[in-house]
């Protein structure tokens, strides 16, 4: 069971706890462009969830998520928290752009800062508040080498990689990018016509991707607008994926399909992506606070 705190205070986030277990912890339920995010504050020495606990949290009523952002004490000077990112199958992710914006909102409202830095497995991430519910996140530089994605074998050009799959529609090669997570982007004429639930999971586990991959299908509508649908590694079909939006813009620009800045249309909303001349990728988009919930003991009664 979870207890819903229906009426958050003007400061709608709990103060950092100190010690104890996950039971009784308050969780901020948020979304970034439709991406379902939980922000769990474990600063003060509380142990991180195990993979089984991560799955159990997702199965609990009111706590289902695409990504769980677990905040721990900072490990590097100048940062406010170390963020461990869980997919809803209990696996870990290196980056989550939409979730990072939600974390930035949580910490900005806590500290009053408009600019802040957090740390993830992918490195330091600078965040900036642009408006009451709008944030820009520096997603860093894309990694483009075949061994950085990683792929199972060397390829001559990561802009165009054949990913053969029996029975799959003729959609051409993928462009592969690592934006903290491995991504494969297929550019198609009609993104709405792709059977995402059928082909997404099959491409995700293709032998070419030893760490699996996030699979995106993108339709370029103009030099500055792309429609996108995403099958997220360890999650499934989602309404939005920030790192996939970044990977898609980088891929489109490398192929000469767009400029280095574009609006990415996702089922849950829009994100603005800019690939700067110094190679950094900036993502700008909305966040929404939904409610707080409390993790109760029976959430973990049958975790596995």
Regions found by a protein language model. Give the residues of each.
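A glycine-rich beta-to-alpha transition motif near the start of alpha/beta enzyme domains, typified by
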Residues: 2-7, 20-133, 184-304
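Low-complexity, intrinsically disordered or signal/transmembrane-proximal segments
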Residues: 11-13
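Intrinsically disordered, low-complexity regions enriched in acidic/Ser/Thr/Pro/Gln residues
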Residues: 135-137
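Segments forming oxygen-rich coordination pockets for charged ligands
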Residues: 140
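Ligand-binding beta-strand-loop-alpha-helix segment within the catalytic cores
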Residues: 143-145
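Short, conserved active-site entrance elements at the starts or edges of catalytic domains
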Residues: 152-162, 201-209
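Internal active-site segments that recognize and position negatively charged phosphoryl groups
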Residues: 159-193
């Amino acid at each position: 069971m979870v207890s819903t705190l229906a009426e958050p205070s003007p400061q709608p986030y709990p103060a950092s706890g100190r010690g104890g277990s996950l039971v009784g912890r308050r969780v901020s339920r948020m979304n970034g462009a439709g991406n379902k995010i939980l922000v769990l504050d474990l600063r003060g020495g509380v142990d991180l969830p195990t993979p089984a606990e991560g799955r159990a949290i997702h199965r609990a009523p009111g706590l289902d998520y695409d990504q769980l952002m677990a905040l721990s004490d900072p490990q590097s000077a100048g940062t406010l928290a170390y963020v461990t990112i869980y997919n809803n199958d209990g696996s870990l992710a290196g980056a989550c752009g939409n979730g990072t914006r939600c974390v930035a909102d949580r910490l900005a409202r806590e500290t009053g800062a408009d600019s802040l830095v957090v740390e993830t497995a992918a490195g330091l991430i600078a965040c900036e508040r642009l408006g009451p519910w709008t944030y820009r996140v520096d997603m860093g530089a894309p990694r483009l080498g075949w061994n950085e994605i990683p792929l199972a074998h060397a390829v001559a050009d990561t802009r165009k990689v054949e990913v053969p799959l029996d029975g799959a529609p003729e959609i051409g090669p993928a462009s592969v990018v690592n934006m903290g997570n491995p991504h494969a982007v297929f550019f198609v004429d009609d993104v709405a016509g792709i059977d995402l639930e059928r082909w997404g999971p099959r491409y995700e586990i293709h032998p070419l991707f030893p760490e699996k991959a996030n699979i995106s299908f993108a339709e370029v509508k103009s030099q500055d607008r792309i429609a996108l649908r995403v099958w997220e590694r360890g999650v499934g079909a989602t309404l939005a994926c920030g790192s996939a939006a970044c990977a898609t813009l980088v891929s489109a620009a490398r192929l000469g399909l767009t400029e280095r800045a574009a609006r990415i249309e996702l089922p849950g909303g829009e994100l603005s992506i800019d690939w700067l001349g110094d190679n950094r990728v900036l993502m700008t988009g909305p966040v929404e606070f939904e409610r707080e919930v409390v993790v109760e003991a029976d959430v973990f009664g049958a975790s596995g």
